[in-house]
A protein has these predicted regions:
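Helix-loop-helix hairpins and the membrane-proximal interhelical loops
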Residues: 1-51, 164-168, 198-283, 426-428, ...
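Helix-loop-helix junctions within the multi-pass membrane cores of secondary transporters/permeases
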Residues: 2-38, 59, 80-89, 93-138, ...
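Conserved active-site and cofactor/substrate-binding residues in soluble primary-metabolism enzymes
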Residues: 16, 32, 36, 53, ...
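Residue-level signature of catalytic and energy-coupling elements of molecular machines
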Residues: 21, 41, 125, 195, ...
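Loop-to-helix transition at the N-terminal end of transmembrane alpha-helices
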Residues: 46-65
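Membrane-helix interface/capping residues of multi-pass secondary transporters
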Residues: 49-50, 75, 99, 391
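Transmembrane alpha-helix interface/packing and boundary motifs in multi-pass membrane proteins
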Residues: 63-76, 186-192, 251-258, 289-299, ...
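Membrane-embedded alpha-helical modules
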Residues: 95-206, 210, 325-436
Length: 436
């Protein structure tokens, strides 16, 4: 244990061995849904569900291990939710592109990430982002998580004509159990009980099973499916065709801004940013993200990156890479316990996402709302992330609005060259983004 403490510098980060383990368990619990949801989405693209689940686990295990052992950060890596839906429903079903070609486009984007990271260009781009935008990423992700939690628990539903959303059936058993989970976690947080989020998830899950809101797991263990049918099946030649190149560009920009916003947002909440709002040694988590993006299509799944649900582990006290390693171990074990892991219902982990959304609002006090050239772009980031249900749209809007506001004010010289480059990429993002 002493060797682990020294390797991860646990005491230097103001943490403890027990806290890191608890944080890893908490993070895994809130993101374990990806094991089931990712294959379910990619099945629409033609990727078989069994091998896809194994590929999801492999991508998560490799990404989390690299993040923990190399970057020493408590950020969990797994296939992104937004990108998998983009590939399945827009690229494959909408544009008629084969899933093998789509995976080839993801691989190309990953190689570009690695090149930019080695050349330190990704780091320079990040450092060109104003602090107001960086903190708005954390706030926006927080509201995004809150909205996800409200929707998954049934507290908020798709609205009728004239109203985009509406209150769910708040008196039904599933929603009542979720409300119980929210109140329980809130009470535990107020009382400053260690492991409040994880305790809340476990207790709420037991209540869900006991009240028959969701069925008890039919089995606990089972052998994972072989990944052979989809391993290494990406089509690089097809990905370089004129039809697929816009897809590769869109994937590149989506993954770039998603990862950038998530890393900075999580780092702001964890207290990792320095006095200038920069993340020290940011090239390490960025390199992990780039390598994970290359490995994912090799395994047979879509873009991987830092998960916003890592915020739950950070709130539980996770501050080192040991948290990510624990998440990796949990994912590895989950390959043999998929029936049990998949049984954890949204009513159990949804309330945790809502509470974490509250926690992530803290950086909003560091945004200067008296300077409209700072507050208008920040407001756009936060509102668009939440109301478009798309993190990338919010971030890219901020990249475009900040230079615009400074130019209008006559202070274009305050905009760094890197931000102009990000604005250009953001413009391409909106041009090529598939809106249907």
């Amino acid at each position: 244990l002493n060797a682990l403490r020294r390797f991860f510098q646990i005491e230097a980060h103001g943490s403890s061995f027990r806290r890191e383990i608890l944080a890893g368990l908490t993070t895994f619990t809130t993101m374990s849904y990806i094991i089931v949801v990712n294959p379910a989405i990619l099945k629409s693209a033609g990727i078989p569900a069994g091998p896809s689940m194994t590929a999801t686990v492999l991508a998560a295990v490799c990404g989390c291990l690299m993040m923990g052992l190399y970057a020493n950060r408590p950020f969990a890596i797994a296939p992104y939710m937004g990108e998998n839906a983009f590939i399945a429903f827009t690229v494959c079903l909408g544009l008629g592109i084969r899933w093998q070609t789509a995976l080839g486009a993801i691989f190309i984007a990953g190689v570009a990430f690695i090149a930019l990271t080695i050349l330190r260009l990704r780091q320079k781009l990040v450092e060109s982002i104003p602090t107001s935008l960086r903190y708005s990423f954390a706030v926006g992700i927080g509201l995004f998580l809150t909205f996800v939690g409200l929707n998954q628990t049934g507290m908020v539903e798709l609205g009728v004509a004239g109203a985009p959303v509406k209150a769910g059936a708040l008196t039904t058993a599933p929603v009542l159990v979720a409300i119980f989970g929210f109140l329980l976690i809130g009470a535990l947080v107020i009382r400053k009980i260690p492991g409040a989020i994880l305790i809340g998830i476990v207790v709420t899950a037991l209540v869900v099973f006991a009240t028959h809101v969701a069925p008890w797991p039919k089995a606990v263990f089972g052998m994972p499916a072989s990944v052979a049918p989809i391993f290494g099946q990406m089509d690089l030649r097809g990905a370089l065709s004129l039809k697929a190149l816009p897809v590769a560009l869109t994937i590149f920009i989506m993954a770039f801004v998603d990862t950038m916003g998530t890393l900075i947002g999580l780092s702001a909440r964890a207290g990792f940013l320095d006095e200038n709002g920069n993340l020290p040694q940011i090239e390490r988590p960025m390199m992990v993200d780039a390598i994970a993006t290359v490995l994912s299509p090799l395994f047979g799944t879509t873009t991987s990156g830092a998960f916003v649900e890592s915020a739950t582990g950070i709130e539980a006290g996770g501050r080192t890479g040991l948290t990510a390693v624990v998440v990796a171990i949990c994912f590895a074990l989950s390959a043999f316990a998929a029936p049990f892991v998949s049984a954890i219902p949204a009513q159990a982990y949804g309330p945790a996402l809502i509470i974490v959304g509250l926690f992530m609002l803290a950086p909003i006090t560091r945004i200067d709302f008296t300077d409209y050239t700072e507050s208008i772009p920040a407001f756009a980031v936060v509102s668009l992330m939440c109301f478009t249900y798309n993190i990338a749209v919010g971030i890219t809007a901020g990249f475009l609005l900040y230079p615009f506001c400074k130019v209008v004010q006559g202070k274009a010289h305050e905009v760094k060259a890197g931000l102009w480059a990000l604005a250009a990429l953001s413009l391409l993002f909106f041009i090529f983004y598939p809106y249907k």
